[in-house]
């Protein structure tokens, strides 16, 4: 396919047009009084959103060069969403501001490479100051405030996320699912739950709930398939003398072994239940080891030299309560040693830090949560599918922002934190005038998010920015109430990580756009009339 090649100011002007189109569509959503965007879907109902990244993902421009500019801004939003889960609109506004100011200076003769170096130096200083101004999250109230703001000032969602985090701890897994009705609620699963149910309904002890309930039970953990009863006999005889129930977790239990267990359960000779091991391959081995550590048992594995027929009660784990239904097994209050569990948690944490795969990271975090206190499920209810999708997006945003706040602390919200970093730009050493111009570009751009928040709230940006620059500390403009106040005390706070990533990603892409001298894109395809269209017209005329 033929390529369209443009250079210099023409290339940058086209890119700017794409950047502006994308940014202008996204930035209407910024702030507590930001507006909604309605997105037409090819199939199904249109979606209504106030989530920056959802808007950005839908935009594709007709002109190929303008589209390149738009897609690069989409990259800013995506990177920020991936890293912090929120701050996509702030990042977009910052990128547009840095690029727009930079392109004017390049047109006036500034060296793009020196401008970029100036911008990079400024961002480094601003990020450092941001970290200094950051405060650690100290209580549940602050978690609720962060979540409320990220959920577009929905205090119900904020409270729900704070409650969930209280119950499962900062390392606990919180998942978001659609509720069957219109009610939104939190359900907490304490202990370790995995998605494997009983191998036979004959193991059920509570016929009303169709669950197997075992109290003060032993747990046998084996990584191989058990089909011959002879292997199980010694350990079953030892357990029957204690009178305590037994849960068997193995790769599979079938044939003679399963039949014998069922018969013994029905006769009342043995309180027993059996489930398959969770996961597959290496992940299964790791999860069995987690269960063993949590319950104080040992994985009976021939790879390690342990044989099932030689197993004694010392090999078994214990738990205060075990609930098994058709699909899930829940182990509560395992008998493992605290120091062993903590060592395993530390090991999983270091694996999370070292992995580059998002999928692996998610699975490791699930394992971490199961070891460290449980899983909270947020069931999101809504009257319509459109409302459900919009609400779910907001809950996801709030959840990510809350985690970011726990990691790196919080700063004053409402665009004020960025303005408070401006003094950090005063004493940066530069090599030439163009680098100083790059620093000034960042100085101006740090005001852009606040201007946009005020503009969306129907105010005059320049006046309010000036008033806030003259003040100090956390004093700022609360766009929701229209008052000037201490934003930290008013609960208008942002996660430091969100603000930092928005800055870094915006500056990175905007600087690259500034230093672009040539753009190569596919030629724009002309709209061609459909084949046979003229003939159709003639035929239809004859029919009339």
From Swiss-Prot:
Query: Keywords, A to Z?
Result: ATP-binding, Chaperone, Cytoplasm, Isomerase, Nucleotide-binding
Q: Sorted alphabetically, which InterPro entries does this protein's record hold?
A: Chaperonin_Cpn60_CS, Cpn60/GroEL, Cpn60/GroEL/TCP-1, GroEL-like_apical_dom_sf, GROEL-like_equatorial_sf, TCP-1-like_intermed_sf
Q: Which Pfam families match?
A: Cpn60_TCP1
GO CC, sorted alphabetically, is:
cytoplasm
**SUPFAM superfamilies named in the record:** GroEL apical domain-like, GroEL equatorial domain-like, GroEL-intermediate domain like
Q: Where is this protein found?
A: Cytoplasm
Q: Which family does it belong to?
A: Belongs to the chaperonin (HSP60) family.
Q: How does it assemble?
A: Forms a cylinder of 14 subunits composed of two heptameric rings stacked back-to-back. Interacts with the co-chaperonin GroES.
Please identify the protein, giving its name as recorded. Answer: Chaperonin GroEL
**Organism of this sequence:** Amoebophilus asiaticus (strain 5a2)
